[in-house]
Regions:
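Short amphipathic beta-strand/extended segments with alternating polar/hydrophobic composition
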Residues: 361, 413-418
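Short beta-strand edge segments in extracellular beta-sheet folds
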Residues: 416-426
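Glycoside hydrolase catalytic-domain context in secreted enzymes
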Residues: 1-386, 392-410, 425-813
Length: 813
């Protein structure tokens, strides 16, 4: 491979060894993230089965979401291609050919729509985000399509992405009319059917499953990246046993979700979002209020059976250690199992959820009859609740129930933990930014009754005493002072300004397609270089190909639209006398699909693969992983995020962070800090939320990632929290992240947060401890300098931010 050190990438289109190796890993990661939701003996399919492959995602499988979470990889494998690679007997070629033509026509029309809309807005990305591509329906499935079939594989795909929430309508959250007709037709013809859901989040299936008997298997594949089709084929034909587990509850009805009709655009109010459900998010709500879901949190089937046996439980001041033995009790298939541990807390005092995830571990691959012993550590703070009035995290005296299983719905009460006296785990200061939130009525009386039931059962189970100690506070180390004049330091407060304002993909100067860079204004005088940033979290987002003017040695730009959809919207233009370079990055599974592996070792491996590509393409900071909570299934960006549970999200993000940062010169940027839970009006929506809910649900994952992974950077979110933009919030950036958690890295804004008139205020970003405004524009510089001259912004505040930035540059450059 011909590698150029001045310009990133290669002049050759040859597939390099790194691409081959990373494709192998991407396939393995995709396989582990696939969740088997139903199987009535249909899977795995026999190799010689005659299959009707149908549905809009069969040949046009969605590899990932749109926007900054997309990856411009070389090529992706569809489910059709993956099955053809295994010489599957596909008998529906005519249907697939017809759909291919419909799809291409729809794409052409959509492209024209985007180009026209882009003429009438300041930022072309706004036109793109406001008009997401909707995959067209296929023609009706007929007898001719299935007459030779012994089974059907029907693929439902959904596109979602940055800038727009999913819609509560047919063809998005619900099945389209044509999908319903096709699936009922297959049922009437008694064709055993595998239903595959290829979407960034749930699709409602309750009525379909109630009205059919021949949908014998369901796979939730999420969006699996470039090797998705191969991974699905491996699962379908039994070459890999599914081991993925849901990280988000699938409800029977959308209206079962807490505050369902108050989300985003549904109540007609995009200015404020009332977090009225409080701590009852996802399974915490369904489990506490007794609402049965379609598929529970942590659920996922296998081709084999496992037995999970409690072997011991011990405690020390740091936490509880549960020892379990897992045995593959099947006779045919090897497989992996996830052991999940939930805790029930005392219900007297502050209201609490019925159960919460406090620990988990995944086995290695076990052959039939093989066993593995797991020691699962449940950290002390996982048992704590936040008390607003006392401003402390407290582990309450009383009995705690330990539930063990392979999903929330299958977890059994297995042991008890007794705490003799209240323990203050951490003392905090009251946040200045707050709102009065009217939360939904809790179910305290019912939870107390259920607590009496499970505490009585503890008498027949193993019990241990637990005496936790107050959490040791990590001290935030201030970086060394610099003697550089304060006026010269101000350019560090914003990014390396390109000639255009952009949302993504067009702010990079040195590496085409990167998101942006720190300022290099201090390079000539002080020798301080810039750091280069690239989007994620499903890989490295770069421009796949670009041209360099030989004479001027400058890169030909493509603009915002050229950075989207792998260049599809503007096409490729070859300039005379130019040299062309290629940047072939790997499209790994999206965040949700990776998280469905429940495999911390795999996540750390993933981080190391990302770091290898960062080094190859001269990237210092990866703008990932995404840690926002799956608060509602309609959030358009859920595919980037891991889970509805902060403990799971935080521990997985910490693993990815350790993987990336194991390679010198590579750092992560965990995002979006915090409450980035809707895309419609994402830059202006104000999240009204109680301090307890904020700390226990929406900040907890970030806290775990900071303390266990030590990320180099954090990205603040666009939205307001209790009336204050996240990038302007001293509560978030300084009091919580630095003073409470000991975070000593850099905090940067999301892109263009200061551009809207009612957006974040540049100088307040600096005062709050949001060190860098990205991607930077001249107005940011003027606003900060004016505030400093007027005394609103102090020299100390500027130097604090600058010193943190300089420390990071020294570490990564």
């Amino acid at each position: 491979m011909e590698k150029n050190l001045k310009h990133s990438g290669t002049r050759s289109t040859e597939v390099c060894q790194r691409e081959i190796d990373h494709a192998v890993f991407a396939r393995e990661a995709a396989e582990e993230g696939i969740v088997l939701l139903k199987n009535e003996g249909l899977l795995p399919l026999k190799k010689d089965t005659k299959i009707a492959l149908l549905g809009i995602g069969a040949e046009k499988t969605i590899k990932g979401g749109t926007g900054s979470g997309d990856v411009n990889n070389r090529e992706s494998v569809s489910i059709y291609a993956g099955m053809k690679e295994k010489n599957a007997g596909i008998v529906s070629e005519e249907w697939l050919k017809d759909y291919h033509n419909r799809y291409e026509q729809a794409r052409t029309e959509w492209k024209e729509q985007i180009l026209e809309a882009a003429k009438h807005v300041d930022n072309p990305f706004d036109a793109y985000a406001a008009n997401p591509f909707a995959m067209p329906d296929g023609r009706a499935v007929t007898n001719e399509d299935i007459e030779a079939a012994e089974a059907a594989v029907y693929v439902i795909s959904r596109i979602s992405g940055e800038g727009k929430d999913r819609r509560k309508r047919k063809g998005d959250y619900y099945l389209s009319d044509q999908e319903e007709k096709d699936l009922y037709f297959l049922n009437e013809q008694k064709i055993p059917t595998v239903l595959i859901i290829n979407a960034g989040g749930p699709v409602e299936l309750t009525d379909l499953l109630a009205g059919t008997e021949n949908i014998c298997a369901i796979l939730n594949i999420s969006q699996l990246g470039q090797e998705g089709g191969n991974a699905v084929a491996d699962i379908l034909f039994g070459e890999f046993t599914p081991s993925g587990k849901l990280t988000t509850t699938w409800t029977k009805r959308y209206d079962d979700c807490p505050a369902a009709e108050e989300f985003s655009y549904l109540n007609g109010n995009l200015e404020t979002e009332e977090y009225a459900e409080g701590i009852y998010v996802g399974y915490r709500y369904f489990d506490s209020f007794g609402i049965e879901p379609l598929f529970s949190f942590g659920y996922g089937l296998s081709y084999t059976e496992f037995d999970i046996r409690l072997c011991g439980i011990n405690t020390d001041s740091k936490g509880v250690t549960v020892t379990v033995e897992v045995e593959n009790t099947g006779t045919t298939y090897s497989g992996k199992e996830v052991v999940q541990i939930y805790a029930s807390l005392p219900q007297d005092g502050s209201r609490k959820e019925f159960r919460r995830l406090v620990g988990y571990e995944k086995t290695e691959e076990l052959k039939p009859g093989e066993k593995e012993m797991l020691n699962i550590v449940l950290p002390a703070k996982a048992f704590a609740s936040f008390l607003e009035e006392q401003q402390e995290w407290r582990i309450q005296a009383g009995a705690y129930g330990i539930w063990i299983g392979n999903s929330l719905s299958e977890a059994k009460l297995s042991a008890g933990v007794k705490v003799s006296a209240d323990v203050m785990m951490e003392k905090t200061k009251k946040l200045e930014d707050h709102s009065e939130v009217v939360e939904i009525k809790d179910c305290a009386e019912e939870l107390c009754r259920r607590a009496e039931e499970w505490t009585a059962l503890l008498e027949e189970l193993p019990n241990v005493s637990f005496e936790p100690e107050t959490e040791e506070k990590k001290v935030c180390r201030f970086p060394e002072e610099t003697e550089i004049p304060v006026e010269d330091l101000i350019p560090l407060m914003y990014g390396n300004m390109s000639e255009i304002r952009s949302t993504l993909g067009a702010s990079g100067i040195k590496v085409p397609g990167t998101a942006g860079e720190t300022s290099e204004a201090l390079l000539d005088q002080y020798g301080i270089p810039s750091l280069i940033m690239a989007d994620g979290p499903a890989g490295i987002r770069l421009q796949q190909t670009y041209e360099v003017d030989r004479e001027k040695d400058t890169v030909y730009g493509t603009g915002v639209l050229g950075s989207l959809e792998n260049g599809y919207l503007v096409g490729r233009k070859d300039h005379e006398g130019a040299e062309r370079y290629y940047q072939y990055c790997t499209a790994f599974p999206v965040g949700t699909a990776l998280a469905q592996s429940w495999n911390k070792k795999l996540m750390e491996q993933f981080g190391r693969k990302v770091a290898a590509e960062m080094e190859e393409f001269h990237i210092n900071l990866w703008l990932a992983p995404g840690l926002n909570i799956h608060r509602n299934p309609l959030c358009g960006r859920n595919f980037e995020y891991y889970s509805e549970d902060p403990f799971l999200a935080g521990t997985l993000a910490a693993a990815v962070t350790r993987g990336v940062q194991s390679r010198p010169g590579c750092g992560v940027t965990i995002k979006h800090f915090a409450c980035n839970n809707q895309e419609d009006n994402r830059m202006g929506v104000d999240a009204h939320i109680s301090e307890r809910t904020l700390r226990e649900i929406y900040l907890r994952g970030f806290e775990i990632a900071v303390k266990e992974g030590a990320p180099t950077a954090i990205m603040s979110s666009y939205n307001l929290i209790n009336g204050v933009h996240a990038a302007n919030s001293k509560d978030l950036c300084t009091r919580i992240a630095r003073e409470e958690w000991g975070f000593d890295g850099v905090i940067m804004s999301d892109w263009n947060t200061t551009v809207p008139e009612d957006g974040s205020i540049p100088w307040v970003c600096v005062a709050a401890g949001n060190d860098i405004i990205m991607p930077g524009n001249p107005d940011d510089d003027k606003n900060i300098r004016d505030a400093y001259k007027e005394g609103k912004l102090t020299e100390k505040e500027i130097r604090l931010c600058a010193n943190r930035i300089l420390k990071l540059i020294r570490r990564l450059s």
